[in-house]
């Protein structure tokens, strides 16, 4: 069996560890105006779940956080007015909210794997 990364061999040896991938809501809900991005995130999801199935027998948990729109460099080209409106109406999340979700995932009991955690801004429903 191939190793997915240098770290998983150490996690397998110690029979514990967590690998969390950052995916996107686009990995489970097609975004029609971003077909390449959507395809790449569907691929991430396939990688997450095949990896999880390979290493779970060794006590290594693998999951993905799938956020909706987050204030990141990907939005740097948005006009200022659009960004302000999106922030005001609650259609964007802050990076700290994604980080807190990852912390939730890795602090569950060792016999629990949060496989996928979809997080959305309050005014977004997909």
Name every feature range the model reports, one short phrase each:
Residues 1-6:
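Short, small-residue-biased leader/transition segments that mark boundaries at the very start
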Residues 7-15:
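A short helix-coil junction within the Rossmann-fold of NAD(P)-dependent oxidoreductases
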Residues 9, 53-56:
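Alpha-helical segment proximal to the catalytic Tyr-Lys
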Residues 24:
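Residue(s) in the substrate-gating loop at a strand-loop-helix junction
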Residues 31-35, 90:
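Active-site loop immediately N-terminal to the catalytic Tyr-X3-Lys motif
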Residues 40:
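Active-site helix of classical SDR
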Residues 61-71:
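Conserved SDR Rossmann-fold cofactor-binding beta-strand/turn motif
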Residues 64-65, 85-126:
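C-terminal helical subdomain
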């Amino acid at each position: 069996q191939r190793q997915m990364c240098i770290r998983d061999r150490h996690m397998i040896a110690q029979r514990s560890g967590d690998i969390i991938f950052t995916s996107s809501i686009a990995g489970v809900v097609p975004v029609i105006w971003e077909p390449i991005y959507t395809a790449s995130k569907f691929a991430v999801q396939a990688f997450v779940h095949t990896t999880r199935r390979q290493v779970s027998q060794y006590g290594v948990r693998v999951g993905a956080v799938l956020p909706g729109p987050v204030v990141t460099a990907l939005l740097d080209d948005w006009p200022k007015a659009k960004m302000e409106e999106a922030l005001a109406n609650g259609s964007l999340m802050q990076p700290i909210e994604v980080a807190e979700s990852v912390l939730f995932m890795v602090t569950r009991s060792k016999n629990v794997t949060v496989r996928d955690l979809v997080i959305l801004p309050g005014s977004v429903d997909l």
